[in-house]
A protein has these predicted regions:
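N-terminal amphipathic alpha-helix/helix-capping segment at the start of soluble metabolic enzymes
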Residues: 1-39, 81-94, 99-102, 230, ...
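Short beta-strand elements of ligand-binding domains
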Residues: 97-100, 172-174, 242-243
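C-terminal helical cap(s) of enzyme catalytic domains, especially alpha/beta-barrels
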Residues: 76-86, 228, 266, 277-307
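Metal-dependent C-N hydrolase catalytic cores
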Residues: 95-118
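Short, basic, glycine/proline-bearing loop/turn elements
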Residues: 32-41, 67-73, 113-114, 244-247
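Short, flexible loop segments at the rims of nucleotide/cofactor-binding pockets, characterized by
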Residues: 11-12, 40-44, 116-118, 185-189, ...
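Alpha/beta enzyme core
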Residues: 48-72, 78-79, 110-240, 254-277, ...
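Active-site clefts of carbohydrate-active enzymes
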Residues: 238-250
Length: 310
């Protein structure tokens, strides 16, 4: 297809993009792409009759990632309100992807009551194939808080998935949360070299490297993330980088989001994500809107808000 920028692409253009077209459209957007995160297990959402995904698109998000999806029981995803992944994707005319976890291989359901089914979102080959079949536009590999996921687990999953599925999957990979037992990627106190791990992820086939956002994750500076983003872009030209505003700070006030957004922009990352730690399974619509305005200004934000059905 003709190359275009995601931030100015209409719905009919987005609908015809391949996985690698989408990747290129993000690169061409020059650091202004906003990704929302939709937590599915908490309930139907903030507004009756409207999914959180659609709400975030209406407030300026360019992409949405679905978290805690149960791929073994698709009816067990309250936040989708009975829809499949493909249905809101078609209705919103925007890229929708899936967050898959990479916990230790020995993880088992132990009979304890969990907030959500951990095994339903593990990055198995079967789940990846299901994401492809359900028309997910991208997959994000990581580890939710409390999962005990190591960056090495994520490298191994990246290598396995890209070897089997290739460019059928637009693959994001990294570690921006779950930092209790092992520090996140880019933390100066991590017991591993961030650049070495990033190179391993890129060599394994990752299309985009996920990093914590300065100002949201404790101990993470703009200078440090800027340094690793530069490494991502130079290690293999065309590889993207994403900063992730989470660690519950996504539930702060819009003024805080504005300040962090400017730090995120300074890192040089291509995608800027905001977490789901608000009320009802996503950050507040006002915070999504503020992130969008701070990163790309009002004209492109208003375009995204007004072009849901274009």
């Amino acid at each position: 297809m003709k190359a275009t920028r995601l931030i100015s692409a209409a719905g009919d253009e987005i609908g015809t993009m391949s996985t690698m077209d989408l990747k290129e459209s993000i690169r061409r957007s020059e650091g202004r792409v906003v990704m929302g995160q939709h937590l599915l297990f908490t309930g139907p959402g903030l507004v009756r009759g409207v999914t959180n995904s659609k709400l975030m698109f209406a407030f300026g998000a360019d992409m949405v990632m679905l978290n805690t999806i149960d791929l073994d029981d698709l009816a067990n995803n309250p936040g989708l309100q009975g829809l499949s992944i493909e249905e809101p994707r078609k209705k919103c005319c925007r890229p929708i992807g899936v967050y898959l976890g990479c916990p230790k291989a020995e993880l088992k359901d132990d009979g304890k009551k969990e907030l959500y089914r951990l095994n339903g979102m593990i990055a198995t080959d079967e789940h990846v194939q299901k994401c492809i079949d359900l028309k997910a536009d991208f997959i994000v590999l990581g580890g939710n808080p409390g999962s005990g996921t190591s960056i090495r687990d994520i490298v191994a999953a990246t290598k396995r998935i890209k070897k089997k599925f290739g460019d059928q999957v637009f693959l994001f990979a990294g570690k921006w949360e779950d930092g209790i037992h092992e520090k996140v990627l880019g933390d100066p106190l991590a017991g591993y070299d961030a650049k070495e791990m990033i190179k391993e992820l890129i060599d394994a086939g990752a299309d985009c490297i996920d990093l914590p956002a300065p100002g949201s994750r404790h101990g993470i500076s703009t200078e440090r993330i800027r340094e690793v983003v530069e490494f991502v872009h130079s290690c293999k030209p065309g590889t993207l980088a994403m900063t992730f505003l989470n660690s519950s700070v996504e539930g702060a006030d819009p003024d805080t989001i504005r300040l962090i957004a400017l730090k995120m922009k300074e890192t040089g990352a291509d995608v800027h994500a905001i977490g789901d730690g608000g009320f009802g399974g996503c950050s507040s619509p006002e915070n999504v809107h503020q992130l969008s305005v701070s990163l790309k200004g009002k004209p492109y934000t208003y375009f995204r808000m007004a072009s849901v059905n274009r």
